[in-house]
Amino acid sequence: MGAPEIELDLWPDKDGHLIVCHDPKVDRTTDGSGMICDLTTSEIKALDAGFWFSPAYQGIRLPLFEEVLSLVARRTVLNIHIKTPVAQRVTTDKMKARGKELGERHISHAVIMPPLPVGVEDVIPEIENRPIVPYDETVFRRIVDALQRFDCMDYAYITGEADVLTTARAVAPDLPRCCLEGHMNFSIVEHALEYGCQRVQFCKGLTTQAMIDKARANGLICNLFWADTPEEARAYFDIGIDCVLTNNYQPVAAGLSR
């Protein structure tokens, strides 16, 4: 397809191997159930991750990180989103409501959402003041080791929240970092600067033009999650976004090239 970047999500399984999957559970994407962290590699590899999408994909398995690297290393840039274990996450009723609104407005109805006007930023203090437990260094070193083995340290960057950014900065300071901390709390740019990030990954519907302008003024590359039509992607590029994540690459890329 020629995508300049691929975004993927990583979770460690019970054996400590790195599984590529969006969700912390296998329930939605396979014929199994349970948390990835509670399942062994062999248990996960026995699950069918393709049948629900199309009969043509029946029998496809959730890949290990190394299996993905064996296919794409040095062929494209990897945006490696290291997910935070659910047990470490802190939320509030207000944040749950914000997430529900995001889902209803922008996932269910695919609304093209321009940046919000200045003044709507509503930072939830409980999220900002929560204790941060650094991401497991042993697991993080496995990620770095895999990148080094496949000689693609120059073709990857790490995306995560405060726990991941803290560990990334300590363990592999030269590996570029992309900030997600505060992406639903209007504080993402400040945290990107706090953690010495090179990129920031905004969430549509929770971004203002002032946030984009501040990020660019500080030399940050601006990602945005997400846009699934050429019109929506173009609208975000026009206001200063550098890289748009999409679930629909081919039609979006074709539309933008016209």
Name these PLM-found stretches.
Residues 17, 30, 90, 168, ...:
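Short glycine-/acidic-enriched loop or helix-start segments at secondary-structure transitions
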Residues 4, 22-176, 198, 218:
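Metal-dependent phosphodiesterase/phospholipase catalytic core, i.e.
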Residues 11-15, 23-24, 83-85, 160-163, ...:
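Active-site beta-loop-alpha junctions enriched in small/polar residues
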Residues 176-258:
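C-terminal active-site rim and adjoining tail of enzyme catalytic domains
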Residues 2-4, 17-18, 76, 242:
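The start of beta-strands in P-loop NTPase/AAA+ ATPase cores
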Residues 1-12, 192-200:
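Catalytic domains of carbohydrate-active enzymes, especially glycoside hydrolases
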Residues 8, 80-82, 202, 246:
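Conserved beta-strand positions
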Residues 13-18, 236:
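A glycine-centered beta-loop-beta connector
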